[in-house]
C-alpha cells in the first residue's frame, strides 16, 4: 500500500499571513490578544494559538474597550469595522488580500448603486463579511448558492447588475452558476475571471490528478473549512471514496480495505505537520511507500501590516 501526496497542498499565502499576524501581535504586545472568529478554519492551528495567549471570540462585545483585536482571514463587514473604531479597539486586519479584493468590488457596486449578486455559501464568515460591504438601500445585494437559487432572485432588470464570488468555492459549481446567471441576465457584469483564489484553484486541480491515481482520498482539514470540504467533494464526484479528517485520530482502518494507493491532500488552512502525522500513522497500518504528485509551484507571499513587519525585520 502506497501514499501519493498532492501538490500543492496545505497552507496558502493568506493563511500564512493571518497566522503570522496573530503570532507577531502576541510577541510584540503580549497576551491576551483577541481574535474575532477563528483566524483560519483549522482546529489544530486555533488550539496552538490559544496556547500562546490568543483569545477567540465571535463578536466584538466580548472584547474589552481599548483592547487589541485581530480580524480573521475571512474578513468582516463595515459594521464590525465601525464598531471597532467606535470602541477604540486597536485592530490588526488579517483579512486575506484576495478577499479584500472582492470587498472592494462590492463596495464599488454599492457606491454606484449597482445591484450585486454574490455567489457563495450562506452563513460562511467570508460571505457575511462580503455582503456587509454593501450599504446602498436603493439597489441591493443578493446571495446565490446554486443554479436553482437564480430563479428565486428578486431581480427583474439586468441593467446595472454585477456578480462576485466567494474565494473558496467549487470551480465547477461556480462555473455552472455563472453560466446560468449570464443566461438569465445577458448584460450582467462581473470580474474578468471569477474570484475563486489561486490556492483553491490549484488545490482542486491537484485533487483531480490525485483522484485519477488513488482508490481513497484523505483530505486533511477541519469540518468548517470551506475549501477543504470542496476538495473532498471533488474527489467523491470523480468516483473515489474521500474522507475529510482533522488528523490521524480520525482514520478508520477499514477504509483501507482493498486500497493500493491512498491519495492525501490538505486544505489551505491545514498545516503540513498534520499531513506528516497522517503519513506516519498510515505507515503503522501497512503503508510502505510515499511519493509526491507533481504540481504547480506557488510563490505567492502576502506581507503582514507595517507595524508588525518592522518588528519582524528586527
UniProtKB/Swiss-Prot annotation:
Record GO terms (molecular function): 4 iron, 4 sulfur cluster binding; 4-hydroxy-3-methylbut-2-enyl diphosphate reductase activity; metal ion binding
Cofactor: [4Fe-4S] cluster
Sorted UniProt keywords: 4Fe-4S, Iron, Iron-sulfur, Isoprene biosynthesis, Metal-binding, Oxidoreductase
Stated name of the protein: 4-hydroxy-3-methylbut-2-enyl diphosphate reductase
A biological process from GO: terpenoid biosynthetic process
HAMAP family, per the entry: IspH (MF_00191)
Function: Catalyzes the conversion of 1-hydroxy-2-methyl-2-(E)-butenyl 4-diphosphate (HMBPP) into a mixture of isopentenyl diphosphate (IPP) and dimethylallyl diphosphate (DMAPP). Acts in the terminal step of the DOXP/MEP pathway for isoprenoid precursor biosynthesis.
Enzyme class: oxidoreductase
Residues reported in the UniProt entry to bind [4Fe-4S] cluster: 12, 96, 197
Organism for this UniProt entry: Actinobacillus pleuropneumoniae serotype 3 (strain JL03)
Cofactor note as given: Binds 1 [4Fe-4S] cluster per subunit.
Binding-site list for (2E)-4-hydroxy-3-methylbut-2-enyl diphosphate: 41, 74, 124, 167, 225-227, 269
Active site positions, chain numbering: 126
Amino acid at each position: 500500500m502506497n501514499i501519493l501526496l498532492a501538490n500543492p497542498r496545505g497552507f496558502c499565502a493568506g493563511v500564512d499571513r493571518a497566522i503570522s499576524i496573530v503570532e507577531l501581535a502576541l510577541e510584540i504586545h503580549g497576551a491576551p490578544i483577541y481574535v474575532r472568529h477563528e483566524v483560519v478554519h483549522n482546529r489544530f492551528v486555533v488550539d496552538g494559538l490559544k496556547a500562546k495567549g490568543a483569545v477567540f471570540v465571535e463578536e466584538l462585545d466580548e472584547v474589552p474597550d481599548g483592547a487589541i483585536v485581530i480580524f480573521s482571514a475571512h474578513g468582516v463587514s463595515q459594521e464590525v469595522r465601525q464598531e471597532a473604531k467606535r470602541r477604540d479597539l486597536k485592530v490588526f486586519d488579517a483579512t486575506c488580500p484576495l478577499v479584500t479584493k472582492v470587498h472592494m468590488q462590492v463596495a464599488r457596486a454599492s457606491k454606484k448603486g449597482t445591484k450585486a449578486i454574490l455567489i457563495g455559501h450562506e452563513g460562511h464568515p467570508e460571505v457575511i463579511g462580503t455582503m456587509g460591504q454593501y450599504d446602498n438601500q436603493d439597489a441591493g445585494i443578493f446571495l446565490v448558492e446554486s443554479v436553482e437559487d437564480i430563479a428565486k432572485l428578486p431581480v427583474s432588470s439586468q441593467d446595472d447588475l454585477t456578480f462576485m464570488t466567494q474565494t473558496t468555492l467549487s470551480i465547477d459549481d461556480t462555473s455552472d452558476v455563472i453560466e446560468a446567471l449570464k443566461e438569465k441576465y445577458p448584460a450582467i457584469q462581473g470580474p474578468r475571471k471569477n474570484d475563486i483564489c489561486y490556492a483553491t484553484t490549484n488545490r482542486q486541480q491537484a485533487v483531480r490528478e490525485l483522484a485519477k491515481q488513488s482508490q481513497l482520498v484523505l483530505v486533511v482539514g477541519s469540518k468548517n473549512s470551506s475549501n477543504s470540504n470542496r476538495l473532498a467533494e471533488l474527489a467523491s464526484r470523480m468516483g473515489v471514496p474521500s474522507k475529510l479528517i482533522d488528523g490521524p485520530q480520525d482514520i478508520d482502518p477499514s477504509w483501507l480495505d482493498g486500497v493500493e494507493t491512498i491519495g492525501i491532500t490538505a486544505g489551505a488552512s491545514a498545516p503540513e505537520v498534520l499531513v506528516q502525522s497522517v503519513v506516519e500513522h498510515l505507515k503503522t497500518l501497512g503503508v510502505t511507500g510515499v511519493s509526491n504528485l507533481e504540481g504547480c509551484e506557488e510563490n505567492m507571499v502576502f506581507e503582514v501590516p507595517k507595524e508588525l513587519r518592522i518588528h519582524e525585520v528586527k
